[in-house]
């Protein structure tokens, strides 16, 4: 499979993860039911479904830790008052950058994807905010990481 096609599939998976996390965070819907409904309504390859599950469950299970990282990087923006899209985008990106131990997506690819999601689904200022938070986190936590491979 070509890089462009893989990147496009991963972009669609990240959109699905964003929408699932947003729904779960804004409602009382059970995360596993929302995820399974999405997989039923929008079939995808096994690899994409596994990536989606990893992003959704990983970002959700680690949200307390990820939210602390967000608040460290943006102390004037409490996570509880943050727009839901921005919060979900940041949780997904930070999960990929700081926690995901199945595969290591390059920093640049994670940030570019997060900024694109923020532009597509967030407010006028979302992409700048997301880029700023992720830039701060990368400087603080990942400055020594070698990322020579592109997604």
UniProtKB/Swiss-Prot annotation:
Record's keyword terms, sorted: RNA-binding, Transcription, Transcription antitermination, Transcription regulation
* SUPFAM superfamilies found in the cross-reference section: NusB-like
Quote the cellular component terms of the Gene Ontology held in the record.
Answer: cytosol
Can you name one GO molecular function term for this protein? RNA binding
Q: Which InterPro entries match?
A: NusB-like_sf, NusB_fam, NusB_RsmB_TIM44
Q: Which GO terms describe its biological process?
A: DNA-templated transcription termination; transcription antitermination
Disulphide bonds annotated for this chain are none
Protein family (similarity comment)? Belongs to the NusB family.
Please name the NCBIfam families in this protein's record.
nusB
Q: What function is annotated for this protein?
A: Involved in transcription antitermination. Required for transcription of ribosomal RNA (rRNA) genes. Binds specifically to the boxA antiterminator sequence of the ribosomal RNA (rrn) operons.
Q: What is this protein called?
A: Transcription antitermination protein NusB
Organism annotation: Chloroflexus aurantiacus (strain ATCC 29364 / DSM 637 / Y-400-fl)
Upper classification of the source organism reads: Bacteria, Bacillati, Chloroflexota, Chloroflexia, Chloroflexales
């Amino acid at each position: 499979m070509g890089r462009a096609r893989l990147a496009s599939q991963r972009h669609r998976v990240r959109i699905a993860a964003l929408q699932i996390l947003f729904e779960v965070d804004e409602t009382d819907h059970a995360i596993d039911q929302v995820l399974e409904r999405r997989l039923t309504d929008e079939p995808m390859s096994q690899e994409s479904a596994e990536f989606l599950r990893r992003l959704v469950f990983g970002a959700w299970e680690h949200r307390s830790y990820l939210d602390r990282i967000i608040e460290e990087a943006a102390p004037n923006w409490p996570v509880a008052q943050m727009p839901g899209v921005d919060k979900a985008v940041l949780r997904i990106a930070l999960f990929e950058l700081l926690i995901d131990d199945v595969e290591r997506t390059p920093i640049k690819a994670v940030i570019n994807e997060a900024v694109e999601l923020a532009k597509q689904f967030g407010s006028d200022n979302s992409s700048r905010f997301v880029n700023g938070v992720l830039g701060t986190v990368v400087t603080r936590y990942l400055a020594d990481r070698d990322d020579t491979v592109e997604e």
